[in-house]
Every structure is written in structure tokens, then in C-alpha cells.
Amino acid sequence: MFNKLQPFVQRLNRSVEYARLLYRDFRIYDVGSYALNRLTPRKGYSVQENVAYGLRARHRLDLFRTQKPREHRPLIVFVHGGAWMHGDKKDYRFIGEAFAKEGFDVAVINYHLAPEHIFPASIDDLSLALNYLNVHQLKYQISTEKVVLMGHSAGAFNVMSALYHPKPYEIQCRNQITAIIGLAGPYHFDYKGDPICADAFDQNRPYQEVMPYYFVESNTVKHYLLVAENDDVVGLSNAVDLDRRLKEKGNYSQLWTVPRIGHISMIGSVSSLFSRYFTTKQKIKQALEDALKH
């Protein structure tokens, strides 16, 4: 009996240890993001915090308006990661600043978290935020003519699922979504029993009914999938599989590896404090230039 149980116990112990280490990494990132945001420059943009895009407490976004807008005033909507159970927009001021200084308006959104709210709640929240920004663009002096969705980790899954979803929420500016940029995103994996994110999904629902990989359709959106060279959280196959499926459907997709970074550090390396030492922001800018060129 013990011999039969031993492999299971070993797997369970490994899962617990993995979850503990990732939890530690999130806590370290919280401290790091606090420091990044304290050191983030306040020049070159204005910010309106806690804009209510819906009626619930987590229906909030921070809106960064550039002081030197590009042509057509493109809007980046950023969705944070955190295994669908952790994270807050306040930790990502450095994202707003990093791209507002490049001529983009940036909306950084909150969304409802697991385990209280499981898939597709966070996807519906993103769609609601997009519709709010579209309706109120004149009020906030922004434009939804050129929208770029960008997300990290779980947030990358969310932005991809906003388009590729079993029962998509109607997005009013759907035809104005020019590009999707996924940073270290999980797009094609089995979450059943996963030690990190099992509580974010209905365990009785097969992943084939959830993952955006299975709902890709042909469109004119440009897709940019960035993976971290040293990612030990999200498997490379997620981006490789999605890139292949997008191309099979005739879509535009680019798969790029960012060297010398891991899963958590990928997003921090975008900040003005660290972007000179890593190529993450450079590759995102390359994607933006490619997506928005005439």
C-alpha cells in the first residue's frame, strides 16, 4: 500500500514545494514592484486613478494619458498577471509610464480574482473595461481607433481569450483591436489539479472548452507572443502551439524569445529603471511599430 502511495506523495510534495516557491516569487515581486513604482518618473504623462468601468469593487482602472500622443492616439490596455488569484493595477504604474513616454495612452485594469471568481469572470471584466473606454473616449480624451491589448502571464491569457473564447462577450471596439501582445502567457494547458491555478477554473470543465488555442479564428489582428528564455513557470509549448494555430488560420503571428529573463522578471524588465539592460521593452516597441505602421 505504502509503495503504491509513495509516487503520489512525492508528486504532491513537489507540487506543494513548487507552489510555495512561486508564492515566494510573487511576494518578492510585490516588494520589487513597490520599489519600481516609487522610482517611476512622474513626467510626460497624466494619470487618472481608480476610474470605475463597472459597478463592482474590482471594476477599476488607472488611465495614463501621454503628453506627446502619436498619430491616431493609440491606446494600450494592459492586464496584469498573478495566476488569476493575485495582483493589482497599483503595482503597474511603471507600465503606464514606460509606454506613455513613447506616445501611447495606457489603461491598466483590475479584474475579479479567483477563487471567488473563476473563468470567465476576468475575461468578462476585460470586455466590460474595453466597452467603457470605447463609450467614454471623448470624456477622457482618448481614442479607441487603434487598440492594443497587452498582458503578462495570466493577463496574457485574458487578452487572448477576449478574442478567442467559447462564448465571447460583445466588444464594441472589436474591429479596432489592432494587436495583441502576450508576455509569457499560458494559452494551451490542462489546469486540472494544477497546484498554482486550479482554483481559477471549473475543475469539471475540460480545458479544451476554455483555452484560447481552441477558439482561434481568422482575423486581421496582429499577434506577438513573447516568451522568457528562463521561464520555469509557463511552458514554451503554450506560445509555440498558439503561434502555430494562429498561422494555420491565416493570422499574423510573431513568436519572440526575450533572453536573460524569467517569468516574473519579464514584466519588471519593461520599466524605465531596467529597460536599458534587457530587450523586453525594445521587443514590445518593435511589435507596436509593426502593428501600427501604415
What are these regions (language model features)?
Residues Y23-R70:
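N-terminal cap/lid segment of alpha/beta-hydrolase-fold proteins
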Residues K90-V108:
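Short amphipathic alpha-helix adjacent to the substrate-entry channel of hydrolases
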Residues H117-L138:
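Alpha/beta-hydrolase active-site loop
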Residues N131-P195:
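Primarily recognizes the serine-hydrolase "nucleophile elbow" in alpha/beta-hydrolase
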Residues G185-F215, V221:
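Mobile cap/lid helix-loop segments that gate and shape the active-site cleft of serine hydrolases
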Residues N219, L225-V227, D231:
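Short beta-strand/loop motif that positions the catalytic acidic residue
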Residues D232-N238:
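Conserved alpha/beta-hydrolase "acid-adjacent" motif
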Residues V240, K249-H294:
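C-terminal catalytic histidine-bearing segment of alpha/beta-hydrolase fold enzymes
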